[in-house]
């Protein structure tokens, strides 16, 4: 089956339409003239936007929400006994999971760019969004964060270019059709699905092998897990790194907010220089990946430079949320030990007196499987406030808790306290912060609410 099957589809229903990826696909269909309906558990600004675009959306999942539907798309979080999914199966309505449907949307384009990696997918895809828009490629874009340049997280273009993130969870990126595949890094994560790091590496190897012979693999040369899997890939490989790779960054300097400037090097020659407006050394690597993709697409250096310099970050990626009594609040999506360390390192370069980190662990499985790594991740903070674990799709079995993590961190002499409500966190911050402090709100769940309360 190819993208052409959509010629026979008039109405698509999305179960879980409020998610960032599902809403983006729904918006693409609406702008292409399809009828769209959907359901979600709660209302949100994303849902309001889709309603304004013409979508028919229900709050709550009920069988009667399925009306004259040709196709149903559902997320991995939807349970098998979901009444809408049950009705679809009973009535022989075609169903697809989110990744499969995104793959079919991609299949209608010639130049599909899929950005994979345990960390940095949204930021790198966002950088590429700025570059491709500045290069007038008129791309279709689906990204996991909101961007000012496209007024949201989705852009519906009319060209052959399609740019999206490629998530490895449950091997969903194996449903894609990449012409250019990017692997930023490979780390242990999603261990509720993957058995171990070798299982994860095998999935990324399969992803790389999806790229056709005339396509490109963009890979970080400084990640040994990546180096292990790309040796027998049958396409053009472009590698990058700070000290290794075909394309390198040299003469790196940082301004007083931790944003880097650097020279882009190939074969020991300086190609051009770039100034970033997002902090952290990890964003130099993300920018290099974007530059390599640009080279594969023959994008001119002026568009690359302008695209990267015009990028000031995405929603919940080291995002400045506000200031209260000269206390700066920054929010970040970091929820894996590697991401936490990188974000705290970037925060160290930010002008502030003290760093107070508010962290909400994300899922019991991740907290349990990476427990020791979490205990080694918070040395660059003056005070750590731990919220309760955000369960997402999981149930609390009692095997791990934020209190357990806090106890271990305190034994390692980390100044850490456990607070169990957003109100308590906000009250603590109002009492303990001083002018010039930096409050860093971290996590992939709803911890942003604590920051919102503090800023009220």
From Swiss-Prot:
Q: Which InterPro entries match?
A: Mur-like_cat_sf, Mur_ligase_C, Mur_ligase_C_dom_sf, Mur_ligase_cen, Mur_ligase_N, MurCDEF_pg_biosynth, UDP-N-AcMur_Ala_ligase_MurC
UniProt keywords (A-Z) are:
ATP-binding, Cell cycle, Cell division, Cell shape, Cell wall biogenesis/degradation, Cytoplasm, Ligase, Nucleotide-binding, Peptidoglycan synthesis
User: Where is this protein chiefly located?
Assistant: cytoplasm
Superkingdom of this protein's organism: Bacteria
Record-annotated residues binding ATP? 117-123
- List locations, semicolon-separated: Cytoplasm
Any one GO MF term held by the record is: ATP binding
Protein name listed in UniProt: UDP-N-acetylmuramate--L-alanine ligase
Q: Which organism is it from?
A: Clostridium tetani (strain Massachusetts / E88)
Gene expressing this chain: murC
């Amino acid at each position: 089956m190819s993208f052409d099957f959509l010629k026979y589809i008039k109405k698509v229903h999305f179960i879980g339409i409020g998610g960032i990826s599902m809403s983006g696909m729904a918006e693409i269909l609406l702008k292409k003239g399809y009828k769209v309906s959907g359901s979600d558990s709660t209302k949100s600004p994303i849902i309001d936007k889709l309603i304004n675009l013409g979508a028919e959306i229900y709050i709550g999942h009920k069988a009667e929400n399925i009306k004259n539907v040709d196709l149903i798309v559902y997320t991995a979080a939807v349970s098998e006994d979901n009444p809408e999914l049950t009705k679809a199966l009973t009535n022989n309505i075609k169903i697809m999971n989110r990744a499969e449907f995104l793959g079919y949307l991609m299949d209608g384009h010639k130049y599909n760019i899929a950005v994979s990696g345990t960390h940095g997918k949204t930021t790198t895809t966002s950088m590429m969004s700025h570059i491709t828009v500045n290069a007038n490629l008129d791309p279709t874009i689906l990204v996991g964060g909101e961007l000012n340049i496209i007024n949201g997280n989705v852009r519906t273009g009319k060209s052959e270019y399609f740019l999206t993130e490629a998530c490895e969870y449950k091997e969903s990126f194996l449903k894609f059709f990449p012409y250019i595949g990017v692997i930023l890094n490979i780390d242990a994560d999603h261990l509720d699905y993957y058995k171990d790091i070798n299982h994860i590496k095998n999935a990324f190897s399969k992803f790389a092998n999806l790229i056709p012979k005339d396509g490109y693999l963009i890979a970080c040369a400084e990640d040994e897990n990546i180096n292990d899997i790309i040796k027998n890939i049958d396409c053009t490989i472009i590698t990058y790194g700070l000290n290794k790779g075909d394309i390198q960054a040299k003469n790196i300097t940082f301004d007083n907010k931790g944003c880097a400037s650097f020279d882009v090097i190939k074969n020991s020659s300086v190609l051009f220089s770039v100034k970033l407006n997002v902090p952290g050394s990890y964003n130099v690597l993300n920018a290099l990946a974007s530059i390599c993709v640009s080279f594969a697409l023959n994008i001119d250096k002026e568009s690359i430079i302008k695209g990267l310099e015009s990028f000031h970050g995405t929603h919940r990626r080291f995002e400045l949320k506000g200031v209260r009594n000269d206390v700066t609040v920054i929010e970040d999506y970091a929820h894996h030990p590697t991401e936490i360390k990188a974000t705290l390192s970037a925060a160290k370069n930010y002008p502030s007196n003290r760093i107070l980190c508010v962290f909400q662990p994300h899922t019991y499985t991740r907290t349990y499987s990476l427990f020791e790594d979490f205990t080694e991740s918070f040395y660059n903070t003056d005070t750590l406030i731990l919220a309760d674990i955000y369960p997402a799709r999981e149930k609390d079995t009692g095997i791990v808790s934020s209190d357990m993590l806090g106890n271990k961190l305190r034994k390692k002499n980390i100044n850490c306290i456990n607070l169990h409500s957003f109100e308590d966190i906000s009250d603590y911050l109002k009492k303990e912060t001083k002018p010039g402090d930096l409050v860093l709100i971290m996590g992939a769940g709803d911890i942003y609410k604590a920051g919102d309360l503090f800023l009220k």
